[in-house]
Amino acid sequence: MNPKPILFLTVAQVAALLAQEPRPLPADLKVERDIAYAEPKNQRQMLDVYPPAGEKNLPVVVWVHGGGWRAGDKTEVASKPLAFTRKGLVFVAVNYRFVPNVTMDTIARDIAKAVRWVHDHIAERGGDPQRIFLMGHSAGAQLAALVSTDDRFLKAVGLSLAILKGCVPVDGDTYDVPLQVATVAARRKSLGQPDPKFGYEEKFGPPDRQRDLSAVRHVARNKGIPPFLILHVAGHTDTTAQAHRLWSELREAGVPAKTFGAAGTDHVRLDRDLGVPGDPSTAELFNFVEAALKK
C-alpha cells in the first residue's frame, strides 16, 4: 500500500483555500457596499459599512480580512456584522491591495487610508470617529497590529493612535516576521521540504524590511498604543508563539494586553465563529470592547 503524501499548508494558505462565501443579510442588517476610500477608485481599495439603524455616536469596528496578503475579500465576514451591530457598534469591513502587485508597507498604508475614511465619514453613518477598534484575522491580524503600533502609518494620513480604542488581532503568525521566517525555515529543513515559490521572505522582503514590518519592533512606552486582545488557536504552535511574543512586548511597554487561546478550533473556524452566540472567543472579544469603552 502506498502511503498518502502529507500536505503542509501555511496559516495564510488555509485561509485563502477555505475563504467563506458571503451569506444573505438578515432583514434587520443594513449595509452600504463598495465605498471608495482612495482615488482612483478600484475594488481593492473599497469598504463596506454596516450601520445600526437610527443610532448615533456608536463605537466602530474596522475589520481587516485575511488571505495571505494575496487573497480574501471584505465580504468574508460571516456572523460578525450582525453580532457587532446588535451590540451597538458600527461594523466596517475593508479591502486592500495584494502582494506582489504592491509592497507590504503599501498594504499597511491602505489600511491607514481606510481608517482615515472612517474617521472622516463614519459620523454620517452613526459612528464615533474617536472610538475606533482595529481588528483583523491572519494576514489582517498582522496589518491591524502593525498599524496600531507603528504610528507612522496613521500619521501619514493626518491621524494618531489616539483615535484607536483597541486592537484585536486574530490568529496572526507575523507580529515578529523574522521569528516566523526562521521558524518556518527550520521546520522545512527538518521535514525535507522545498522552499516555497512565494513565501514570507518574498512577501516581506529582506531582513531589515521584515523587522520594520513587525509590530513587536514598534512597541514602546508613551506612544499611545491602544489596549490589545490577541486571539489565537490554542493548538497552533506558530500563532500561539507569536501571540505571546506580541503580548510580552506590549506588557513590557505598559500597554494593557491579553491573550486568549481558543481550544477545540482551528485557524478558519476561529474567524468564522466570531460573532456566533456561545463562542468563547466572541465572549472574550465583547468583554474586551466593553472594558475598553469604559476608559
Regions found by a protein language model. Name each.
Residues 20-55:
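N-terminal cap/lid segment of alpha/beta-hydrolase-fold proteins
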Residues 36, 72-80, 92-130, 274-278:
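Catalytic nucleophile-loop/oxyanion-hole region of alpha/beta-hydrolase
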Residues 21-25, 40, 178-221:
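Mobile cap/lid helix-loop segments that gate and shape the active-site cleft of serine hydrolases
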